[in-house]
């Protein structure tokens, strides 16, 4: 059953976990996803929320430099394929023009199947 159907017609509480995309220093996407997969197989999860991590400049300089992270859609697609749990990419939409967001949504749906 798809996550949208689970939300519309819940038979039990819907569980969504948030997992940050791996940092470049964490190794390959495949190895990171394999580790996550073994953890997720031990519990019941309906979907995985993957946030888009951005530097926040509004509050001034960060004490710790933000690490470059994997593309959330690539990571989400990989987790869907390996774990079989739907991914939700939590995108920060205020940074782009509407036309660019429409292209992003179409690409996310068609290329990454999210």
Write out the residue ranges for each language-model feature.
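Active-site beta->alpha loop and helix N-cap motifs at the rims of alpha/beta catalytic domains
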Residues: 1-114
């Amino acid at each position: 059953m798809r996550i949208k159907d689970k939300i519309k017609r819940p038979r039990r509480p819907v569980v969504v976990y948030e997992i940050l995309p791996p940092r470049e220093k964490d190794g390959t996407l495949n190895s990171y996803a394999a580790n996550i997969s073994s953890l997720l197989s031990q519990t019941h999860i309906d979907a995985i929320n993957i946030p888009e991590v951005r530097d926040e400049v509004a509050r001034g300089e960060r004490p710790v430099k933000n690490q470059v992270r994997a593309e959330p859609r690539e990571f989400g697609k990989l987790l869907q394929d390996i774990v079989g749990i739907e991914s939700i990419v939590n995108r920060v939409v205020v940074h782009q023009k509407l036309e660019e967001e429409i292209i992003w949504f179409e690409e996310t749906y068609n290329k990454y199947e999210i």
